Amino acid sequence: MTRRFKSTRKFDKQFKQLDQKTSKQTEKAIELFISDPSHPSLRYKKIQGTDNFYEISVNMSVRIIIEVTSEANDQINTLYIIGTHDDVFPPK
């Protein structure tokens, strides 16, 4: 199975609004996710109550939500949204 990566327009817009330090940390986290999604620093895990959404950590406060789907023999990893924990997981 081949892993493919893409991003949503919302993710792209949110990424452009990050400060320089967080932007660099995000790029590093994405590169690490592409090469080794199980790396402990990413804290990659499935989001409870969803079928195909996962999260990775950029740093202690910023998260990336990823939608993982399948298409033929490909695993599609869509960078869905990015933001602080409270931004991506609003209080219930």
Predicted regions and their residues:
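Enriched for short, Lys/Arg-rich terminal
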Residues: 2-4, 58-92
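Residue-level signal for pocket-adjacent positions within structured domains
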Residues: 6, 13, 37-42, 83-84
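Residue-level recognition of specific faces of alpha-helices
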Residues: 14, 29, 46, 78-81
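A short beta-strand-loop micro-motif that forms or neighbors metal/cofactor-
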Residues: 23, 27-31, 35-36, 68, ...
